[in-house]
């Protein structure tokens, strides 16, 4: 059905040409080939414009092809379908607080309005499909109106064989971030790779991917299962080519053409000489910003006084061409941003075995590896050459770099060392170094990785003060055992926790998913320096992505997108995906403006405002399964439940796994969360048809599964590592509800729970969707004594139970006290 819609859109978009039309004429000329460029090209072609894309390099895709591919798109349709509905005021308020004086309400509102339509357009009309990031939080969870999820999407895996002969023109993923050239998707897929030697299901999952990849290498000389940013570019390219867009590589733009003050095309350098391409509707500049333009870096990056002290992970061909082209016809580059670049720590990976990792003056001999996720894993710290920690290592890459710049004395080069032990590097890897069974020797030989059999020896190899480093590690180890980082708050935000590893930490009896002792030698270090994922400072534009002059007037026929457009975030970084989300959206907007079309006509808004006050946010579905087990089998059953719930074909998320302590004994309670009833139903079918439901077919004596929907005002249940909610005593209470009493109960609980929550947290309140009308609520307590004291205090203060609440309930009331098993995400 999706293919039929796509073929229909293709027919609608046949370019309007005549037999006498010159070869180098088009309606819209797009300079560049990253996400912003191809979003513009695909949308314009769908709207009926003839489009030519010219790319400076030998392969299309730009920095996007190397990226994680995530896009920040609040209120996107996948979140809406999962029941995560929010008013536009929520993300608007978050950005207003985050951006401060840089907040541009017109552009921000335009983005928040059109971004959901952009996603809906591409998934309904093109080859590009998405996966949701509904559990990915914003970077700064302490800022009011930050979200715990529902604001991110990523391109779904893409089969590059669909590109045919144009496959070889697609820029492959950054080799150092792959396994033998095979991209690995973030999230569940990455966890399978980390667990491939530890869990049979993960071993099987990884084995299948490797088999296909090696087959691809034999047949195509490269992988064809694309993920992350490579999948985004692959799907956009297929969509563009199918819509008749011409993509030319090795075709840098030399200068823009103008007539009567309007940009009408550009002169392009080709192997046969220069050619002029006329563009009747305008030109889009999307050449990737200036991450490798020394002159502009010297001007806009204070930590790069010569322009060479900044090592960007962006594509080497991004040298500021679009900015210079825009300036040549009256455009202005924004120079007042808080930061001109999307800062990130990078390590310098030698391209050749004889190249030392930090050899001065030989930048072309190194790949710039961005450290995006390793810093948050438990058992790693970052220190300066003096041996001191200076930051919360689990914070975003941008915030980490801000802290490093602040800790660097004037006149010194910003640099730090990431320190870990042998257990860490063999499980997680470090930077470009892969985990076991991949060898360490090549990295030790070329100097990228430093090793010491004691912390003093490691310090000597790195030029770090040995005494201070030893004291820093000792202090950190003590904090890790307590699960608290009083110095920098590591592990305290939802973003920190989701980047950590709660499962591995809990297996070691620790509490903080981002902290574990550094104690098992040898010890290792990789140096990181000041870098970025791209640049923020670009050509000033209006809400239509039109380039404006110093007076704020649009330059007719000229648009800027991607990193050639000044970031609407003003140099701040409030969430992952704030580069690609706006890039895709403003490309979509620019194409409509060039075609003189309204985006609302192209695609119905997939995320309308809630029409009544009864439509709430964060609706989630749950299954609570109750198994009766033989005495002494709880540990075995829990392990099998975890394996069953994390199989590749499993849907939903394991949230809680408890064993009863008071009430009906020898029962295991398993709570799983789902984004939709459809997903829950499919997983229920899988469980029931399994030869061994929950992996416990040979153990349990009875199994009962109940479907629930969370009270609509409650936030979704999250593991302890993300929510901070812990027991270890959990009370699971179920009440029958009188006919007609459901809405009154929901409303009363919404009114009374916030005050009661301050005494002990309500994990969830949820109404059963099958069987008698009833609801179940789960509370967490530190101990049985704490439960008794808190319940008494709540009654004494008059904050619980809700006044008038019992009148809506039946006499069916059941209470169970349960303790978390070792595999329970709720601890």
Spell out what each predicted region is.
Residues 114-118, 256, 475-480, 690, ...:
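A short structural micro-motif
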Residues 112, 116-123, 237, 323, ...:
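Non-transmembrane alpha-helical segments in soluble domains
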Residues 620, 630, 653-669, 689-728, ...:
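Glycine-rich beta-strand-turn "strand-cap" elements at beta-sheet edges
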Residues 99-141:
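Long, well-ordered early-domain segments
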Residues 2-91, 130-614:
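Residues forming the flavin
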Residues 621-627, 729-735:
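Short glycine-/aliphatic-rich beta-strand segments at the starts of folded cytosolic domains
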Residues 633, 673-679, 738-741, 780-786:
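Helix N-cap motif at beta-to-alpha junctions
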Residues 633-654, 679, 685-696, 739-764, ...:
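Short amphipathic alpha-helical segments
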